Amino acid sequence: MQKRKLLLTNMLVIAITCNAIGTTQGTRIEEVPFTPVHLNDMFWAPRIEVNRTVSIPSAFRECEKSGRFDNFALAAGLIEGEHQGDFSFDDTDPYKVIEGASYALAAKYDKALDHYLDSVITLIAKAQEPDGYLTTCVTNNCTRLSGWWGTHKWERINSHELYNSGHLIESAVAHYRATGKRTFLDVAIKNADLVCKTFGPNEGQIHRPGGHPIIEMALCKLYKVTGNKKYLEGAKYFVEETGRCTDGHHPSEYSQDHKPILEQDEIVGHAVRAGYLYSGVADVAALTNDQEYFKALERIWQNMASKKLFITGGIGSRAQGEGFGPNYELNNHTAYCETCAAIANVYWNYRMFLATGESKYVDVCERALYNNVLSGVSLSGDRFFYDNPLESGGEHERQKWFGCACCPGNVTRFIASVPNYIYAVQGRDIYVNLYAQGRATIGNIELEQTTEYPWDGKVSIRINKGSGKFAVRLRIPGWLKAHPIGDNNLYTYLTPARHPQCAINGTAINVDVTDDYITIHRAWKKGDIIELDLPMDVRRIEANDNAEDDRNKVCLERGPVVFCIEGQDQVDHYIFNKYLLHSTNVTARYEPTLLGGVIVLDTQAKEVGQSGEIRDVQLRAIPYSTWNNRGNDQMEVWIASTPTAAIATPKPTIASRAQTFSNRGPIQNDAPETAPTDSWAGGTNDQWEPKRSSDTSKPYHYWWLKRGSKESISYKFDRPYTISNTQVYWLEFDHYDGDFKVPQSWALYYKDANGQWHEVEAHSAYTTRKDCYNSVDFKPVTTQELKIVAQLQEGYSGGVLEWKIQ
């Protein structure tokens, strides 16, 4: 009976959608819900099924194991104990997985999953306070997390209480749309009513923006479901309040709260927050027909797309603040490109497309979707990347879960909703934005796509049911043009692409590749077939010369898929000593047994030896999204294109063979050398040579959130060595989330054979110069452990780029 009820609910949703499509006379572009879009291809359908059968159950298990559900039980008074977890926003992890599970339930009914969601939602509802408030760490009075939320509700802008509310609302709306049940929606409405009562422009209300955005998107979704305009007004308030600092709080680039949105023209701060905020702004602007906000969004987008977008569709270059650096800071090894940020980038760009009909926004969606987003989850579906660098020395590995577990839940809800991005409608006209095999019911029309995209560019679209006069708009992807994204020159293809071809019922039509879409106006009937051929040649890409880390390098791309080279496919497992000449032919072939079935690229390359000799080698590239599915190894997207850009394999040194550690807690002044160094550290002995103290393009160590304190970093060698010199390259650069400077002073200690620490007898001064190595000679010591103890400058943090031993 429940299954029948669910199916009837979905039919109702589709019927409403069909009616809107058939009668709308305006020009607004509307999304086509994923429920009437059914994929049966060999690319997305298996991934969506793995998400349903592996990723979602795995994420729920981790929520159980990590105490996420227990926190709700504790807030409900059902159990006794301590609040678990390290973050005030841990409640959002179950919300996101519930959202993903709801999408999965709508696509394929599962009785056990349906009942499981009922039980979880019942638990969450019991944790809600009578006035609608719901943040468990506050209800549970977890003083251990008071640094986040303070001493009472709504005290701090960065408490994430509104972030919790936003994900609660989005999850509840998804569950209602999927099942027709109001159990979770009623919880969300009660919470949203409290939010709209508490925050706003009136006397007695709190005057500040959302902190971590998502409440804006969420309230817009709730408005669409309920029709209650107070939710739209609430979303509009949070958008308008951003950057105004009405309550006296400090402006913050980190939260895009540094100036009003209408005055913003550069994308800054935390990348996920930016994507969520601008998605919410786009929602409000669309629902209120506010073109001034869209003008501001276009300015910000242009800055992102022309100066801060990674070739994989990722955003956010720095681990510090999980956000953006200055223009053209697109470092590969230290690229953050958080999985959540890539998903947020899709959300924002798709909304920009809906507002404008411009394909450049879908180009960003597709680029992020096939590369950065899919890199965030293993092919097995149970391991995840938090950050997605474009280069690795083998130190990166997907994890089953994280203390800050925002990404796994986000993956589950996003992958389940991928069919949502394939089609859109404008009146009776149909946009085909993404190409994927399957059927879609849009109004009285049933379309069927047949294709092997993204491995093959041939697409057939058949009208299976229905007829009528309307336009079909077929997107011409950015990967067939001179530049991947719009007309900006951040990235440029080195050679022209072949021209796409299109035919209707076997009759060719003209295609202008400079257009966004191939638009076909006609009276359609059952059996009509559109044949589209998007030539998928391997294309080389060069980056703008201002992107320093990409100079004299090339990226390989075929269709929407960015490729990388990985150590497993090279004879010596080393990749940085290879370079690829522009004249070399690159061939593509399908490998059905590799990585679940992928296109691989093969070519001849050159290799630089340790003595400078040049050798011919074979090079294989795989889709970037599939790297690290065969174990840890080196990887790079941007391949050297000149011998000077290739790096010969360095010979091992005393330092390179050492284990590296740093102190976790504070160092006492009386005996700094004895402080425990129990936290793993990295980046200081990887043999990458810094260009300057602000060179953050390669891994480095920094003392996160430490300012003006004594900090340490230590080496533990594979055996005792006699040493008499050390060289330290200090970190120094400015960042909105923390400034890093060379230390005020430092000293070097060694551990003797009896396990006692002593300072070395230095023959030269402990210098703190920047942009160079600081070398210290000392009386030879035989030791298996060395430690630097650094006194940081007052008010500043610090770090080490590279540390050598002789």
PLM feature spans:
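Short, hydrophobic/aromatic-enriched beta-strand segments in well-ordered soluble domains
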Residues: V472, I476, G527-V538, F717
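Aromatic (Trp/Tyr) and acidic
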Residues: T23-K111, H115, S146-A178, P213-K230, ...
